[in-house]
Amino acid sequence: MKMSDQFLAYLLLRLTMGVNFTFHAIPRFLKGAGGFRDKMVADFSQTPLPPFLVYAFGTVLSYIELIIGILLTIGLFTRYTLVAASLLMMALMVGTSFQQKWDVVASQLIYSVIFFILVWTQQSNFYSVDRIMLGRE
């Protein structure tokens, strides 16, 4: 069967986001996730966010990104993963807005638009574990 351009486009965009999220996390684990978390706490020290919340978020963020990245890459639980990724982007945007890093907020908004597109066009998620193994269309 010839791969349709629509299915190919969806696959490539989903893979791009999956690889992106996976490789946001992997270098942090290689360097030590605690270092990333501690840097986050320091970076947010001048914001009204409580340090214990930043500490907790910084502790789990790399794991969440890795899980989202892997699930997007293989196309498993794609809809739920995209919702989780969108919620994560909202949380990141709140923190980044407190830091007033508007260039980063703009980048996070672009991620959110991409996740919107992936959710909106999910009927094109043909090449995925969801469809192949679980019979989802």
Can you say where each PLM-predicted feature lies in the sequence?
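Extended, low-polarity transmembrane helix blocks
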Residues: 1-35, 51-63, 67, 74-137
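Peri-membrane helix termini and adjoining interfacial loops of integral membrane proteins
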Residues: 34-44
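Short glycine/proline- and charge-enriched loop/turn segments
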Residues: 42-49, 90
